[in-house]
């Protein structure tokens, strides 16, 4: 990872199992997982794309742009205001202290995490991840859900992202899910 090139290496393709725990990844090499990249100080936003070779798109990228124009979309991607979705069109709003996903922020006090999800089916689980480990999870069982969580154990320098898992499955048994781009937080 070279921070000099961070503005062009802002997105990473999200496979359904790229971010799994216990060292079980698509590549079988934990050094190549996004979690390892982030733990080593890497900065990237998460996008979804497909490589099914069958013409059946499943993964998508949601972009939080101020308007529906090419310049606004590319500006949002450069600032990592995007997230990956697999199968369903899940709407995900993840913020810390009112700052959007993709931002690097300095705060006083503890991070106030806010997650709003609008799913297309029941939300099985919302997972807040800090520095590669689960910080908080909620099993709402409804299509729409909100999480407000204060990270009392904040150490002063962390990254956070959110995973959303829906109850529905595709024809291969894969659940619809979404990954927010991270937010990097430091104490002032």
Which residues does each predicted region cover?
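C-terminal functional module detector
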Residues: 14-23, 34-188
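Surface-exposed loop and adjacent secondary-structure segments within mature catalytic domains
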Residues: 1-19
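Alpha-helix initiation and N-capping motif
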Residues: 8, 30-31, 70-71
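Histidine/acidic residue-rich metal-binding segments in metalloenzymes
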Residues: 1-5, 28-42
């Amino acid at each position: 990872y070279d921070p000099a090139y961070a503005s062009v290496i802002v997105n990473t393709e999200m496979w359904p199992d790229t971010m799994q725990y216990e060292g079980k990844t698509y590549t079988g090499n934990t050094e190549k997982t996004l979690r390892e990249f982030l733990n080593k100080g890497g900065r990237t936003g998460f996008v979804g794309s497909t490589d099914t070779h069958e013409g059946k798109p499943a993964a998508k990228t949601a972009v939080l742009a101020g308007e529906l124009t090419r310049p606004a979309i590319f500006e949002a991607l450069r600032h990592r205001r995007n997230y990956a979705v697999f199968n369903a069109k899940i709407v995900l709003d993840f913020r810390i202290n009112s700052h959007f996903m993709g931002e690097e922020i300095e705060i006083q006090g503890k991070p106030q995490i806010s997650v709003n999800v609008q799913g297309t089916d029941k939300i099985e689980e919302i997972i807040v991840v800090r520095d590669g480990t689960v910080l908080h999870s909620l099993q709402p069982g409804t299509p729409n859900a909100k999480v407000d969580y204060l990270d009392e154990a904040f150490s002063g320098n962390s990254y956070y992202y959110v995973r959303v898992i829906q109850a529905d499955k595709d024809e291969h048994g894969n659940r619809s899910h979404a990954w927010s781009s991270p937010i990097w937080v430091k104490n002032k």
